[in-house]
């Protein structure tokens, strides 16, 4: 901000009076903005505060114009079925450059945002994936059987009773599978599978 040099004369004091009707053009300093070629007046004296308020209100008006312009772009892109995130980000940066001629930019360069796909990616073919999914119950049952046999050998009565009830219910479900498939049709994947014969399991001891 420029300052007055030399002794203060009565002529200079007239600038600080509130009843100034006309501003002398010789007392204005024109600062050029090299980016946009715009001129901003820097007023000497107490009228500098009024000029600052006027420029600030102008900047707020520009911000409102930018926001309305972005909202209109969002309404145009609504319902098109495309991802509007990158479009709005690029448009917001371009609009801020056009609107904020004399602003201070805190973000010099926008980093590229990594695009993540929410859809699951299958690295296996459908046949091998189905085979792997079908082998999961067998592995689970085999592990459960081994754990049950260990608990029976250790002699925990309550654990043995609970496991016996669970195993009996599982055997009952296996016996009812053929009848349930005919009564309640399910997915073709299950219908095409041949029900394996159930091997006779020796009765488990209660004690």
Swiss-Prot record:
One of its GO terms (cellular component) is virion component. Its main location: virion. CDD domains: embe-CoV_Protein-I_like (cd21662). It is found in: Virion. Keywords: Virion. It comes from the Viruses. The keyword Heme does not apply. The gene encoding this protein is included within the N gene (alternative ORF). Structural protein that is not essential for the viral replication either in tissue culture or in its natural host. Belongs to the coronavirus I protein family. This is Protein I.
């Amino acid at each position: 901000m420029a300052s007055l040099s030399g002794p203060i004369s009565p002529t200079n004091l007239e600038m600080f009076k509130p009843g100034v009707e006309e501003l002398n053009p010789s007392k204005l300093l024109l600062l050029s903005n090299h980016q946009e070629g715009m001129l901003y007046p820097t007023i000497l004296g107490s009228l500098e505060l009024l000029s600052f308020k006027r420029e600030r209100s102008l900047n707020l008006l520009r911000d409102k114009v930018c926001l309305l312009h972005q909202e209109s772009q969002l309404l145009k892109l609504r319902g098109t079925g495309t991802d509007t995130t990158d479009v709005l980000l690029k448009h917001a940066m371009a609009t801020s450059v056009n609107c904020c001629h004399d602003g201070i930019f805190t973000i010099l360069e926008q980093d590229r945002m990594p695009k993540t796909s929410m859809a699951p990616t299958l690295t296996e073919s459908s046949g091998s994936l189905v085979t792997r999914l079908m082998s999961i119950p067998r592995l689970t049952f085999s592990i459960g059987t081994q754990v049950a046999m260990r608990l029976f050998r250790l002699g925990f009565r309550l654990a043995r009773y609970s496991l016996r009830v669970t195993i009996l219910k599982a055997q009952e479900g296996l016996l009812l599978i053929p009848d349930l498939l005919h009564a309640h049709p399910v997915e073709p994947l299950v219908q095409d599978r041949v029900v394996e014969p159930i091997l006779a399991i020796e009765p488990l001891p209660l004690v």
